[in-house]
Amino acid sequence: MTFSRIGGTGRYLPERVLTNADMEKIVDTTDEWIRTRTGIEERHVATDDEQTSDLCVDAAKIAMADAGVDPQDIDLIVIGTTSPDLLFPNVATIVQHKMGIPACAAFSLETACSGFIYAISTADKFIRAGDTKCALVIGAEIITRLIDWEDRNTCVLFGDGAGAVILQPSEEQGIMSTHLGADGQYKDLLYYPVGVSNNLAAAGVGDSRIMMAGNE
């Protein structure tokens, strides 16, 4: 029986850091209030010229070096994110292009905080089925661009970054099993109120339209 194992890991955090002391200057909060309730002392924030795919690439390069694999070895890319560069093409294909990875299955999953868990579970099943030999799995967010910096209940919680692993086949158990689940009745506990079919015009992006090179 074929199992999957993590062959390499990598992470990337933007250089800019906002400490709790910095947050005290932005909203009515304190370092003590944040730490005692969340354990958070600081968070990293992407620069304006950084995209989620950039964070993914930086984390992926480290993971690939750690695993000793090259771009041509990758035959599956799965990324968990709710803050992609674009609605489409999906961010996995953008990362694929930036890293020079040859044609392979590449897709992203939108499951918020559990995105990386869903991504690694999906890649694990590809490997167990014998469809994949070397998977690049990434969880990444530039979530600070969705934050209300005047809402102290949320803005102190989130930061930007990316983590990546290389998943490979193994005769011995690496990932033993995964169990996925969701309960939609709690959908209003944490959400972003704008989507393509909901409130798009109200968000001020109604002039954005699909672009296509029709002859290609």
Model-derived features: positions:
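Conserved beta-strand-centric core segments of catalytic alpha/beta enzyme folds
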Residues: M1-A21, I120-Y186
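Conserved active-site "lid/cap" helical segment
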Residues: M1-D75, G195, N199-E216
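Buried hydrophobic positions in well-ordered alpha/beta secondary-structure cores of metabolic enzymes
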Residues: I6-G8, I34, A63, I74-I77, ...
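Short, flexible, mixed-charge acidic loops at enzyme active sites
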Residues: D22-E24, D28, P89-H97, Y192
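Conserved catalytic cysteine-centered active-site region
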Residues: R35-D54, T82-A135
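Hydrophobic pocket-lining "lid/loop/helix" segments that shape and contact the acyl-thioester
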Residues: V57, K61-M64, V156-E216
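Short beta-strand segments at enzyme active-site cores
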Residues: V78-I79, V137
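Residue-level signal for short, function-critical loop segments
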Residues: G80-S83, E141, E216
